[in-house]
Design a protein with these regions (language model features):
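Active-site segment of metal-dependent pyrophosphate-handling enzymes
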Residues: 6-10, 23, 52-105, 138-147, ...
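Long, intrinsically disordered, low-complexity Ser/Thr/Pro-rich regulatory/activation regions
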Residues: 189-226
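Short, well-ordered beta-strand micro-motif
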Residues: 14-16, 26, 95-97, 205-207
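N-terminal strand-loop-strand
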Residues: 1-38
Length: 226
């Protein structure tokens, strides 16, 4: 029996909050197929590397984010037979979360608002991968401290609330949010310092605590705004 030849890639859904918008890192393809369309940072897996090593290499070399504080986790695998017209390609997608970062060093890579990255604008099945990555991030904000990965090392509760509002796409009551995040066990650790960078009264600065899961969870509002 002849073993079919299948290529394997890693593709990265890298998200950040820039200019009060949820943004993803993409680049514009110059060659066919899908010339002129936007695509996620990705690359073929080498014979001498495992999946996590390939993802780290693509993050550093293709995405231009070497050394950046990016939370990276495996999202899922995509293997539809016709997802790449050139050959059979299986993609292992990763989700990356980062605080606001400058324009990456890699040529052609740019931050685009998530709402502008429609299926018609993107190559292959990357719009689907991106959408599922965003939904993973939205869901994990409910029960893990992942929201802090969008923030700098030290942040205020108001800055963290804005992350939740932007990622979830909804408004949150400031007092209720403050009560919930400060009441969640080991979610936030006070630094003992404060800042007035929000333009109002000095606000306390926090760091992410050691919690892996939020107890109680931060439930996303349901309704017309979802």
């Amino acid at each position: 029996m002849q073993v079919p030849r299948i290529a394997v890639t890693v593709d990265l859904v890298i998200l950040t909050v820039r200019d009060q918008q949820l943004c993803a890192l993409v680049w514009r393809r110059e060659a066919e197929p899908y010339a002129g369309r936007l695509a996620l940072a990705g690359g073929f897996i080498r014979l001498d590397e495992d999946l996590s090593s390939a993802a780290a290499r693509v993050l550093a070399q293709r995405a231009g984010l070497e050394g950046a504080p990016v939370h990276l986790e495996q999202l899922r695998t995509y293997g539809y037979p016709d997802r790449d017209p050139r050959q059979r390609v299986v993609s292992v997608a990763y989700l990356g979360i980062a605080p606001d970062l400058p324009v990456p060093s890699a040529a052609q890579m740019s931050w685009y608002p998530f709402t502008s990255l429609t299926a018609a604008a993107m190559a292959f099945d990357h719009a689907r991968i991106l959408k599922e990555g965003v939904e993973r991030a939205r869901a994990k904000l409910e029960y893990t401290p992942l929201g802090a990965a969008f923030c700098p090392d030290e942040f205020t509760v108001a800055e963290l609330r804005r992350v939740y509002e932007i990622v979830w796409g909804t408004s949150l009551d400031p007092r209720n949010f403050h009560r919930k995040v400060t009441g969640a066990e080991r979610f936030l650790v006070p630094t003992g310092a404060s800042t007035a960078r929000d333009g109002g009264r000095p606000a306390k600065l926090f760091r992410r605590g050691p919690a892996d899961l939020l107890h109680p969870p931060m439930l996303r509002p349901r309704g017309p705004q979802d």
